[in-house]
Design a protein with these regions (language model features):
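Positively charged n-region of N-terminal signal peptides that target proteins for export
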Residues: 1-5
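Bacterial N-terminal signal peptides
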Residues: 7-16
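Structural detector for internal amphipathic alpha-helices that build alpha-solenoid repeat scaffolds
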Residues: 35-49, 69-95, 106-110, 115-130, ...
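Predominantly the C-terminal beta-signal and adjacent terminal strand-loop region
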Residues: 370-376
């Protein structure tokens, strides 16, 4: 009997502690009507915001079927969604984050109110929490919605959120929208979301490049460089893929128009600037193509010099034999006193070989001093010879 009495006393004591620890905002939420509950959530402090946001979301879900399209219930749902603090979400385990995301998806689905939907979308994006179900639901919505009739605010929030949480499927949906006339008024928002997602769609982008024409490759290249300029690895991978495709196009057509040359130079320049030696094989192959294009007057002198000087950045070892061989070829041309070669090209070859300093360039550089080149060229050759490492 005494034992039961002690348990009862302790029970009341613990209950008293619980109620005494409840904040005024929580008590107001429990006692209040919908408007008062919403006011309590909006007045939340650091001590009670987690509890109040959870109570508001749970209450909205539990009573939606009963209260239907009640505006005050929607307002409570919005206040609960917006109140979820970042620190709370950051401290959750993966399973707990999934549970929270599922609750948000439930709110999104059961409430017709656009304000609730927008609040859910913005919060999911801000907290960066999502499940495969949420991504799939958003993908499904954006793939079938009519941009002419859909609520603009909801659509914009959906694009913004998808850009943060989407996947390769999301990118494909948005890329398809970019081609449609009815989506042109959302073009900027659509492209911004695609820009955030394109890294996740690397495989798909490379597949498009590998079968694309010059115009299609140009669009992808420009898009990636514009939207992912700080992601050097991704930009390099796409640039190498584009350069490789331009080589294939040239080899199968035998001619290079201005559009192809421009794309070659731009993609090569990215690899050069990033010193992307992983593309050594591709850039060496491009040098051979550039020689053919230059000698057939398809590539101008300025671009060809850029290729000569840039190849040392992507293929510092492999390029020596290529550059030396080409310089030797020009030297042979000079054996005929009536022949002439491009002095800027010869100077680019000499300077680049000197900068690399590989002793295997000795013979071709020394030969320059024997031919009828200008004093400037001969002086440059002697300077480069002095830089060779033995």
């Amino acid at each position: 009997m005494k034992k039961n009495a002690l348990i009862l006393i302790l029970s009341f004591f613990c209950t008293g502690i619980i109620f005494s620890e409840a904040t005024e905002n929580i008590r107001n939420f429990v006692k209040g009507n919908l408007a008062e509950k919403t006011a309590a959530v909006k007045s939340a402090t650091k001590e009670d915001v987690e509890e109040l946001s959870k109570r508001a979301v749970d209450f909205a879900i539990e009573n939606k079927e009963i209260l239907g399209k009640d505006r005050e219930l929607a307002a409570l749902a919005v206040s609960g969604i917006l109140a979820v603090p970042q620190t709370y979400a950051d401290g959750l385990s993966e399973d707990e984050k999934n549970t929270l995301s599922e609750e948000f998806l439930n709110l999104y689905n059961i409430f017709e109110d656009e304000t609730v939907k927008i609040a859910v979308l913005n919060k999911i994006s801000k907290l960066n929490i999502s499940t495969e179900k949420f991504k799939a639901a958003l993908n499904e919505y954006l793939s079938h919605c009519n941009p002419e009739t859909e609520n603009r605010a909801v659509l914009l929030a959906s694009l913004h959120t998808l850009g943060n949480i989407g996947d390769a499927d999301s990118f494909r949906i948005l890329m398809d929208h970019a081609k449609k006339t009815e989506w042109q008024k959302y073009l900027n928002e659509n492209e911004k979301a695609m820009g955030l997602l394109c890294v996740k769609a690397e495989k798909e982008l490379i597949e498009i490049i590998e079968r694309g024409n010059v115009s299609e490759c140009r669009k992808i290249f420009d898009f990636v460089i514009r939207n992912q300029k700080d992601n050097q690895i991704f930009c390099a991978k796409i640039s190498e893929s584009v350069l490789s495709r331009t080589i294939y196009i040239y080899e199968n057509s035998g001619s290079a128009g201005e559009e192809l040359i421009s794309l070659q130079i731009d993609s090569f320049s990215v690899l050069k600037d990033l010193k992307w030696t992983r593309a050594s094989g591709t850039t060496i192959s491009f040098f051979d193509i550039a020689v053919r294009e230059f000698e057939s007057s398809q590539m101008n002198e300025k671009y060809f010099c850029l290729v000569i000087e840039g190849i040392a950045e992507t293929s510092p070892i492999e390029c020596v034999s290529k550059l030396s061989s080409y310089l030797s070829k020009l030297n042979k041309t000079m054996e005929d006193e009536k022949s002439s070669v491009s002095e800027p090209v010869v100077l680019s070859l000499i300077k680049t070989l000197g900068a690399i300093g590989d002793k295997n360039a000795f013979d071709s550089l020394l030969a320059v001093t024997y031919y009828n080149y200008s004093d400037t060229v001969i002086a440059e050759a002697r300077e480069s010879l002095a830089k060779l490492k033995w």
